[in-house]
Swiss-Prot record:
Provenance organism: Homo sapiens (Human)
Bias type Low complexity, positions: 7-20
Binding site for ATP: G680, P681, N682, M683, S684, G685, K686, S687
Keyword DNA-binding: yes
Annotated InterPro entries: DNA_mismatch_repair_MutS_C, DNA_mismatch_repair_MutS_clamp, DNA_mismatch_repair_MutS_core, DNA_mismatch_repair_MutS_sf, DNA_mmatch_repair_MutS_con_dom, MutS, MutS_con_dom_sf, P-loop_NTPase
Protein name: MutS protein homolog 4
Linked pathology: Spermatogenic failure 2: An autosomal recessive disorder characterized by male infertility due to non-obstructive azoospermia. Testicular histopathology reveals no round spermatids or spermatozoa in the seminiferous tubules of SPGF2 patients, consistent with meiotic arrest.
Length: 936
């Protein structure tokens, strides 16, 4: 918003009236994050581009006055006359508090690739003159009835700080979503790759990242800063002085702002100094960019440990197309697109965050699955909930606006508060219909959400609102409709002057309509009154059935625009009446705003129930979306054991974009056979299969049904993929170098609870080196209990099963079809996965045969390949002892698995064990019949 300039004075000095020169008494106290801040205690300013007054404090948290040497406007500058916003006695002091600047302009920051530095959060300089432009929008002060920001546009600000010295690697993070008044704190130890930090930031998808200036110093930046800037090229960076990362101040902010019901977070973070330091800097910065403060005891603050959810790194999220399609970079053909049938922005955001951070707690997942199952079985519950949920607005953004207290009383701030109070009334009136829709639900989670709707505070807040706000004031589409709702929101007889102002406004609107009607009669034209938020009232006319004399409108009409056969224009008299209308509106908004602020101050003590309502609505919306997705396909409820078993599973995204249902395949991975080597020709389905496994795993861990006839999953705490093999020109990385970086990341971070999917590792270098690298990587991963699926063209790797009994070989089948027209064989892809090594040898050469390569070249390639293969494979046969140990190993793992997971009755279990014993006896003699000497 525009801030009229004033003369620069010391904040601690008494204000002087520009017109009279008389000394005014200082303004009363202002809120500052729940604290009362007097003009004498306003923070000091240090501006790089202007000389700073002596005496500026260098200690964190010091509050002393200073003045800027930047040019100032004339002493008699003042706001426009007639406005109820901006010409109050406190105007000068408020402007001094809000007109602060950064130490470097945004343009210079862009040129040097270093972020601009915020020397102190507040400044008396003029932001117009300092050249600083804020990238973060002011949320909620839009007069429009629609959201200021779309549901998925970035709106998160993150502060990141790292320990120094022996504490290097200890990371503190604090983030706030401008559309959701919730602060999330994190503190964790990271390694030198900073994988956890990068992954966490990718999930948050920040609009802006704040760091300490000592971490980003030109020529001496930390490794963390370098890695973040490399991975987030399109994110804005801002640095502030290290002293504002103050853990003591951070703890004070939490004590002052956190709602009592969430105050247990204080116990969790008391000794977590780095996340406290991050939240101190974050809140100070948000106060600056939003030009507002949060009301005391109004924020939800929580601590999230890294162990509460599964980790999916950003490269894997891109490879699996969780949110963005790799072809057109949209969210249509993605896992999000498959599951997203949400009706509210909050539900959509919740689905997105769950896909990127799946749950790891089996009990919580099963509670969600119980809900989805009940929604599928009870159509009345499903459609009843869906009908009510679709009527909710963005409750999270609504809360975000309600809990902020603007530093300046502007027209936009007033209009926003009035609008959001109407939205709040609309939201609270949906609580009873939501309760009615849920009254017959049975599952524990749905019953818990139903219980949260029984909170008496919903009724208390709604009753307080209805004592002030008209019963028929409601949310309506269209800017003119919402303007009318805002004007007449407050009941009559509460403020006599407000009633008079509204009558005046009504008369002006009637006069405008009458004037346009008279103009239509005067010129015999079909004129009609129209309205837009930008132009106010104007005149429109269509020329379908009339002919204009000389193809011109009367000279009285000005600002004429034409779109097809429709004219839009105004007149000098209408412009004057619009000005009168706007002046009347400002009076109405001012008086309504005063009443609304008083009402909101009485609501803040009950605000916790609104957070519960927001959580309930977004969760119900997501669960309904899961149920909706199930009705469109034959998904099945997953089970959770220590085995990954999928019967006839298929790729969910491929199903959505294909005309025919994808080919289904089985998957079976256990602790005894936790390493699958998958071979097959190019385009046989290896990459699609790997992605399918990961997508099904994620769907199961967020509480969704999965595309299969039966499915059982082991909880994966990390999901890694190495699939993409494109060169990265921006970072000067070849295919091979990119492969090595990705596989190194996996090896550094994988553990026993990981799901690892690797596709064609080593193809970026020569065959010998590729095989050597793959073999070494396989041996390392085999030392873990992670579930690994390794797709490769190196058939030599298949013989590793002779050394490691937990290796299983699988392959994709192909069929050979005679091409009668060209008298050659063609490959028919079945996309079916089978056990054992592929019978296809040299399928690359077969693909070359059907290409345009000369036959002589293909023949030479075959001869050379045969010689190389004979040399490599001549000593890779297993001994009888290896085969015997392998058989014993598989029997033991089957017995352990049966003991852990069997749900068979005693008789069936006895039969199963008997059959298992027979199979072992049948297999065991064969191992003894293998000749001792296998050398040719």
């Amino acid at each position: 918003m525009l801030r009229p300039e004033i003369s620069s004075t010391s904040p601690s000095a008494p204000a002087v009236s520009p017109s009279s020169g008389e000394t005014r008494s200082p303004q009363g106290p202002r809120y500052n994050f729940g604290l009362q801040e007097t003009p004498q205690s306003r923070p000091s300013v240090q501006v790089v581009s202007a000389s700073t007054c002596p005496g500026t404090s260098g200690a964190a948290g010091d509050r002393s006055s200073s003045s800027s040497s930047l040019p100032c406007p004339a002493p008699n500058s003042r706001p426009a006359q007639g406005s109820y916003f901006g010409n109050k006695r406190a105007y000068a002091e408020n402007t001094v508090a809000s007109n602060f600047t950064f130490g470097a302009s945004s343009s210079s920051a862009r040129d040097t690739n270093y972020p601009q530095t915020l020397k102190t959060p507040l400044s008396t300089g003029n932001p117009q003159r300092s050249g600083y432009k804020s990238w973060t929008p002011q949320v909620g002060y839009s007069a429009s009835s629609s959201s200021a920001i779309s549901a998925h546009s970035p709106s998160v600000i993150v502060a990141v700080v790292e320990g120094r010295g022996l504490a290097r690697g200890e990371i503190g993070m604090a983030s706030i979503d401008l559309k959701n008044p919730q602060i999330i704190l994190s503190q964790f130890a990271d390694n030198t790759t900073y994988a956890k930090v990068i992954t966490k930031l990718k999930i948050l998808s920040p609009l802006e990242i704040i760091m300490s200036n000592t971490a980003c110093a030109v020529g001496n930046s930390t490794k963390l800063f370098t890695l973040i800037t490399e991975n987030f090229k399109n994110v804005n960076f801002t640095t502030i002085q290290r002293k504002y990362f103050n853990e003591t101040k951070g703890l004070e902010y939490i004590e002052q702002l956190c709602i009592a019901e969430f105050s247990t977070v204080l116990m969790e973070v008391q000794s977590k100094y780095y996340c406290l330091a991050a939240v101190a800097a974050l809140l100070k910065y948000v106060e600056f960019i939003q030009n507002s403060v949060y009301a005391p005891k109004s924020l939800k603050i929580c601590f999230q440990g890294s162990e509460q959810t599964a980790m999916i790194d950003s490269s894997s999220a891109q490879n699996l197309e969780l949110l963005i399609n790799n072809q057109d970079y949209r969210n249509n053909h993605t896992l999000f697109g498959v599951l997203n049938y949400t009706k509210t922005p909050g539900g959509s955001r919740r689905l997105r965050s769950n896909i990127l951070e799946p749950l790891v707690d089996i009990e919580t997942i099963n509670m969600r699955l119980d809900c989805v199952q009940e929604l599928l079985q009870d159509e009345e519950l499903f459609f009843g909930l869906q009908s009510v949920i679709s009527r909710f607005l963005d409750t999270e953004q609504l809360l975000s606006v309600l809990v902020q207290i603007p530093k300046q009383d502007t027209v936009n701030a007033a209009e926003s508060k009035i609008t959001n109070l109407i939205y709040l009334k609309h939201t609270l009136e949906l609580v009873d219909p939501l309760k009615i829709a849920m009254k017959n639900c049975n599952t524990p989670l749905l019953r818990a959400y139903y219980g949260s709707l029984e909170d008496k505070r919903f009724g208390i807040i709604l009753e307080k609102i209805k004592t002030v706000i008209n019963d028929d004031a409601r949310y309506m589409k269209g800017c003119l409709n919402m303007r009318t709702q805002k004007c007449y929101a407050v009941r009559s007889n509460i403020n006599e002057f407000l009633d008079i102002a509204r009558r005046t406004y009504t008369e002006i609107v009637d006069d405008i309509a009458g004037m346009i009607s008279q103009l239509g009669e005067k010129y015999s034209l079909p004129l009609r009154t129209s309205f837009s938020s930008a132009r106010g009232f104007f005149i429109q006319m269509t020329t379908d059935c009339i002919a204009l004399p000389s193809d011109q409108l009367p000279s009285e009409f000005i600002k004429i625009s034409k779109v097809k056969n429709s004219y839009s224009f105004t007149s000098a008299d209408l412009i004057k009446m619009n000005e009168r209308c706007q002046e009347s509106l400002r009076e109405i908004y001012h008086m309504t705003y005063m009443i609304v602020c008083k009402l909101l101050s009485e609501i803040y003590e009950h605000i916790h129930c609104l957070y519960k309502l927001s959580d309930t609505v977004s969760m119900l919306d997501m669960l309904l979306s899961f149920a909706h997705a199930c009705t469109l396909s034959d998904y099945v409820r997953p089970e959770f054991t220590d085995t990954l078993a999928i019967k006839q599973g298929w790729h969910p995204i491929l199903e959505k974009i294909s005309a025919e249902k994808p080919i289904a395949n089985n998957t079976y991975v256990t602790e005894g056979s936790n390493f699958l080597i998958i071979t097959g020709p190019n385009m046989s389905g290896k990459s699609t299969y790997l992605k399918q496994i990961a997508l099904c795993q994620i769907m199961a861990q967020i509480g969704s049904y999965v595309p299969a006839e039966y499915s059982s999953f082991r909880i994966a705490k990390q999901i890694f993929t190495r699939i993409s093999t494109d060169d990265d020109i921006e970072t000067n990385s070849s295919t091979f170098m990119k492969e090595m970086k990705e596989i190194a990341y996996i090896l550094h971070n994988a553990n026993d609870k990981s799901l690892i999917l690797i596709d064609e590792l080593g193809r970026g270098t020569n065959t010998e080196e590729g095989i050597g690298i793959c073999y070494a990587v396989c041996e390392y991963l085999l030392s873990l209990k992670a579930f690994t699926l390794f797709a490769t063209h190196f058939l030599e790797l298949c013989h590793i099963d002779a050394l490691y009994p937990n290796v299983e070989n699988m392959h994709f089948e192909v069929q050979h079809v005679k091409n009668t027209s060209r008298n050659k064989e063609a490959i028919l892809y079945t996309y079916k996965l089978s056990k054992g090594l592929t019978e296809e040898k040299n399928y690359g050469l077969k693909a070359a045969e059907v290409s345009s390569l000369p036959p002589s070249i293909v023949l030479d390639a075959k001869e050379i390949t045969t010689q190389i293969t004979r040399q490599i494979l001549q000593n890779q046969r297993s001994t009888p002892e290896m085969e015997r140990q392998r058989a014993v190993y598989h029997l033991a793992t089957r017995l352990v698995q049966t003991a852990r997971n069997s749900q068979l009755d005693p008789d069936s279990l006895r039969i199963y064990l008997s059959n298992l014993k027979k199979k072992y006896k049948e297999d065991f003699p064969r191992t003894e019949q293998v000749p001792e000497k296998t050398e040719e």
